[in-house]
Structure formats: C-alpha cells, structure tokens
C-alpha cells in the first residue's frame, strides 16, 4: 500500500460543545470550515468485487497507547455484558446495601433504582448492564438477537465499567414478531468468522433518519435483495431455483445467517477475508485506523477508530456489512481514486451540529453539511479524551418500497 501525501481530514474541529448529560444540545455551526492538513491520509485501495476499501492512516502515526474498551461481541460471549427487554430490568439491578426492615425491603433485598420503575417491554428500548471492569464500546448498526424482537443499536456510545443498568436506544429489525424467544439477547453471529452488523443503507436509516418505519423499509429491501442475490447460488440445489421469499423471515439477522446469503456475502468479501491475516498485518504495519468504502464506484461510507487495534477487532464485522451492501443491485460508476476518497474525508464539516452524552463518560456529535453527515464518539473517561469512533456517510435519498407488506409501511 502506498501512502499518498494529500490533505487529510481532522475531527479536531468538532470539539467545542460542552458535554450534555443524557440530553441533546443543537446549534447551527458558523459554516463550513477547512480541516487542518495532515491529520488523516488515504492509502491505495483494497479491491474486493464491487467493493473498494481505502485504508486510512494518521499522518503522524500517533495512536493512543492503549484502547481499553470491551466490544459488544466480546462482552456477550463472556457473559460480562447482558441485554434484556425493558420489562425484565429488575433481574439486572446491582445489589445495594441493605436499608430498612425486611418488610420495607420485601423479599427482594435489592433496592430498585428510581430511574427504572416497573414497566413493560418497549420496541425501541432495551436495558443493558456492563459487569466487566472495562468500558463497553457500542457502535450504531451492531445487532443483538433474541428477546421479543432482534434489535440494532441506534447510535454509538460508551458504557462505563461496572455500570448500573442503562436504557439503550435501539431499532427493531425483525417486524412482525413480539413473542419472547429468549430472556436475554445474544450476538448476531455464531462465530467471529461470520460476525456482521447491518449494512450501511440500514445504518443510515437508524443513525440519520432515526425512524422505525424507515428502518423496517430498509430491512425489507435488504432482505428482498439478499434473496435475489442468493437465488442463483441455490438454483442448482434439489428442488430448482430459489424463490425470493425462500427465507420466509422478516429478521435481518436471520436473513444474514441464511446459508445461501452468507455464501454470497463471503464471496463478495473473499479477496479481503481469504487473506484476512495478511491484510490485517499490512494494516497494522501501515498503522491504519479506518477505511473509506466505495460500492460499485460510489463512495458511501467511512469508519475511523482511535487505533489499529480497534479497527482489527471490528474488521470482519465491518467488511461483511460492506459486502452485504454490495449485493444491492445498481449501476456502476467510474472507479474512485485515492484523491476522491481523500476529498470525501476532507469535505468541510459545518451546518447543524447536535451533541449529547454522559458527563465524564462520552460525548457524541452529529454534523451535517451538504451531502454528508459525520458522527463522532469521543471518550471522556480518565486517561482518554480522544475520538474512539468516527463515522461519515454520503446521504442517500430514502426510497419507499412500493408493494412492501403492510407491516413495513
């Protein structure tokens, strides 16, 4: 990979809003501001079918000495992270010192936090607790399965180590089911090699539109396209060609787990995933911290992390989500260059800025300018004070899927 000396993109201009404790602050920025040169540089791309992945490095090679975060998949696998429906919060509450008489405490001698009164299950809220001794990093687009519906994380956030239960904003990606399949939620994939998150077009509806119906529409469209893409792969099997309704599911996660779909996703990602260790070794050597993503010649997304270690831990999950996006049919554009990818990163960030977070834990900002939107998750935990994840996307128009089942409308 060749490092080109081009003006880079800095997230530093995004600083300036004070953290807001569990509420949002919105302000109009003064206008587009040019980014300081040299913060990020784009490398020569890795080609994988209709995918083009441009690795991104910090110009000075500087990275945090350590990124002490636990990922969602790691936490669920070890049992250190639990997520459940809102109505089951009582079982997750941490023990409190015994206060009062037995009669005052009742049979359950744990004190139920006032912020979590008895309540029913909710489509767009789960309750999560981090039992580990590390802060938990959650990325928008990550999937948890089980409960009464599969869900997707709505926005990036950090959950402190040893936390009390928190309300977690989510979107349903399995319309039509509201019956419990399990008491707690699990990871979407059975193994790390097949991990995934929702593809960029679905992530956009969750992160930008923040609209459940839009998420359902995009899930429906993605499932239809997965079925269509998988049909040729299954046509040689006993029983003839595969129907576009062959999966018989409204769940995005179950669609991605379908063997024929998984085969197509792996095929789309093959040039990257077959040499995964070699690619990751090269990324580490170059001190890469993220990628700019182009699908069929159109630059659509960028994911940047605090360091190479975090990028490597999310690599499979990210690449398979990009590969799923490449299954969406469409016309191909001219192959973008390194300069095109650099311009995408270097585009001014201005317009309207929205900020929210948790004092002393994290700050999350959204900036929209022109045809792009940028999302920045900054850690405020002791010893950090840096951007943990930056997502940037090219806004695409929402398409209403005519003929979608009523549940998607």
Protein language model features and the residues they cover:
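Positively charged n-region of N-terminal signal peptides that target proteins for export
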Residues: 1-6
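Bacterial N-terminal signal peptides
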Residues: 8-19
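Intrinsically disordered, low-complexity segments enriched in small/polar residues
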Residues: 20-135, 141-409
């Amino acid at each position: 990979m060749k490092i080109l000396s081009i003006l880079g993109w800095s997230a530093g201009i995004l600083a300036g809003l004070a953290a807001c404790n569990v509420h949002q602050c919105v302000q109009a920025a003064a206008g587009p501001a040019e980014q300081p040169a040299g913060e990020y540089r784009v490398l020569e791309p890795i080609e994988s079918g209709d995918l083009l992945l441009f690795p991104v490095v910090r110009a000075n090679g500087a990275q945090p000495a350590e990124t002490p975060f636990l990922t969602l998949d790691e936490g669920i696998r070890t049992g250190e992270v639990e997520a459940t429906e809102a109505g089951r919060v009582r079982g997750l509450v941490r023990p409190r010192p015994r206060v009062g008489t037995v009669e005052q405490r009742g049979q359950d001698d744990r004190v139920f936090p006032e912020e979590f009164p008895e309540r029913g299950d909710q489509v767009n809220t789960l309750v999560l607790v981090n039992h580990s001794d590390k802060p938990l990093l959650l990325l928008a687009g990550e999937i948890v399965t089980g409960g009464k519906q599969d869900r997707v994380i709505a926005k990036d956030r950090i959950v402190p180590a040893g936390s009390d239960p928190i309300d977690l904003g989510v979107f349903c990606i399995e319309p039509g089911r509201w019956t419990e399949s399990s008491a707690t939620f699990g990871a979407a994939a059975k193994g790390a090699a097949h991990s995934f998150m929702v593809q960029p077009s679905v992530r956009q509806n969750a992160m930008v539109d923040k609209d459940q119906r839009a998420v359902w529409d995009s899930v429906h469209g993605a499932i239809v396209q997965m079925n269509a893409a998988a049909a040729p792969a299954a046509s040689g099997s006993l029983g003839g060609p595969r129907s576009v309704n062959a999966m018989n599911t409204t769940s995005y996660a179950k669609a991605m787990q379908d063997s024929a779909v998984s085969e197509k996703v792996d095929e789309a990602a093959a040039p990257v995933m077959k040499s995964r260790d070699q690619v990751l070794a090269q990324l580490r050597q170059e001190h890469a911290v993220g990628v700019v993503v182009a699908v069929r010649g159109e630059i659509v997304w960028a994911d940047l992390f605090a360091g190479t270690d975090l990028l490597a831990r999310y690599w499979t999950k990210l690449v398979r989500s990009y590969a799923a996006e490449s299954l969406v049919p469409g016309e191909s554009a001219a192959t973008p260059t390194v300069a095109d990818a650099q311009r995408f990163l270097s585009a001014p960030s201005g317009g309207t800025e929205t900020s929210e977070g948790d004092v002393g834990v994290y700050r999350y900002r959204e900036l929209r300018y022109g045809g792009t939107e940028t999302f920045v998750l900054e850690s405020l935990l002791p010893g950090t004070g840096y951007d943990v994840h930056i997502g940037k996307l090219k806004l695409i128009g929402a398409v209403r899927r005519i003929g979608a089942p009523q549940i998607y409308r």
